[in-house]
Amino acid sequence: MSLVDSEIIVGIDFTQNKRLNQLLSDSAYFPLVLYPADDAFTAQSPLLKEALESASGGEKRKLLVIVVDATWFFAKKMLRLSPNVRNLPKLSFQQLYTSEFTFKRQPAEGCVSTIESCYHLIREMQSADIVPAQIDPEPLMAVFRRMVDFQLEAEQKRIAMGIPGRHSYDAERDVNRKKRQRRQRVENPASSKS
């Protein structure tokens, strides 16, 4: 499972990160940070397509999406500490998605995990003809769903063994989880293929 042409850059403050700054200063790219904002671009934004086509030398600019992989608390901290990332234009989704990360509660409606974000972003970029249709993001969600199922099974084993929970989510108290999962997969079969 991988995203072609992706790189992982680890840290908290990226202000002096040589590799990231090299990418951000490369005129071949149009850099955006995948993060919610009222003025965020979406895949369908005409301004996004204009920005990608406005390269010098007649070549289209490549979309460079910075995906912050952290809890919401640390994602905010990373942006606060990294003005080179914080000041980038934001990229968000056309619509709100419901997270399938049923093991962990999201802080608000429309908040999804990093893997889900990448999946939905690819799908929206495909619908806008920015990403080729032959790129298949389904393996991302297949692995993600297996990970969630594994986490939930481990939680059930923990409960059966009488070990106290350490998370804000506790499957013991969420008796409707499986019903919600089934209903979500029936209502949205395209995103629930494994």
Which residue ranges define each predicted feature?
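C-terminal folded domains that constitute the principal catalytic or ligand-binding module
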Residues: L63-V65, T71-S194
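S-adenosyl-L-methionine/SAH cofactor-binding core of RNA-modifying enzymes
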Residues: L3-N84
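Generic structural signal for bulky hydrophobic/aromatic residues embedded
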Residues: S2-L3, L121
